[in-house]
Design a protein with these regions (language model features):
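A generic "binding-loop/recognition-motif" signal
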Residues: 26, 93, 101
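C-terminal segments of enzyme domains that contribute to small-molecule binding surfaces
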Residues: 33-67, 101-148
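Catalytic-loop signature of eukaryotic-like protein kinases
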Residues: 59, 78, 85, 95
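Short glycine-rich donor-binding/catalytic loop of glycosyltransferases
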Residues: 72, 84, 90-91, 102, ...
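Short, flexible helix/strand-to-coil boundary loops that buttress conserved ligand/catalytic motifs
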Residues: 24, 79, 91, 109, ...
Length: 148
C-alpha cells in the first residue's frame, strides 16, 4: 500500500515488502494512541497528523523490505536503497544508501555521467524509442562528453 501523498517517477523498481510511512505517532502528548489523531477512533473530527508529500524520482530502485520513515521528502533520480534499509533522511540523485539508519555507500556514477544521464531524460522516452536507444545510452556512460 502506497500512501496517496507519495509520487513516483518513471522506471522505478520497488521490491516486495517495501514500507513507506508518512507520519509518526505524536510522542509529546499524554498518549501516543490513535485517539489523538485518527477520526475513525471517534475522538477527533479529522486526521490530525501532518503528512508532507514524498517525491521519488525516476529510475529509483528500492530494495526488498526497505522502510522509508516520516521526514523523508525526496529520493533523487537514479538512487538505490539497499534491501532492509531504514531511510530516515532524503537520498540524493544517483546515491546508493544502505543500513539502519541508511547511510551513503557510494555514488552510482561520476558527475559527468550523472550530467549526461540527466540531460538525456531517457525515462521520458516511450518503450520503442528506449529500445532503439539502449546501446546509445550505455555508450553515453562510457564517454559522457561524446556518446557517438
Amino acid at each position: 500500500n502506497i500512501p496517496p501523498d507519495v509520487s513516483f517517477g518513471n522506471c522505478c523498481s520497488i521490491a516486495s515488502g517495501v514500507r513507506i510511512f508518512r507520519a509518526n505517532h505524536p510522542s509529546g502528548r499524554f498518549t501516543t494512541h490513535p485517539i489523538l489523531y485518527n477520526p475513525a477512533m471517534g475522538y477527533v473530527a479529522k486526521d490530525m497528523l501532518e503528512r508532507p508529500p514524498l517525491e521519488i524520482g525516476h529510475d529509483v530502485w528500492i530494495g526488498a523490505n526497505a522502510i522509508i520513515l516520516p521526514g523523508v521528502s525526496r529520493i533523487g533520480n537514479g538512487a538505490v536503497i539497499g534491501a532492509g534499509s531504514v531511510v530516515t533522511k532524503d537520498v540524493g540523485p544517483y546515491e546508493i544508501v544502505a543500513g539502519n539508519p541508511a547511510r551513503a555507500i557510494r555514488m552510482r556514477f561520476d558527475e559527468r555521467q550523472i550530467a549526461a544521464l540527466e540531460s538525456s531524460r531517457w525515462w521520458e522516452l516511450d518503450r520503442h524509442e528506449l529500445a532503439d536507444r539502449i546501446g546509445e545510452l550505455d555508450a553515453m556512460l562510457q564517454n559522457p562528453e561524446n556518446p557517438e
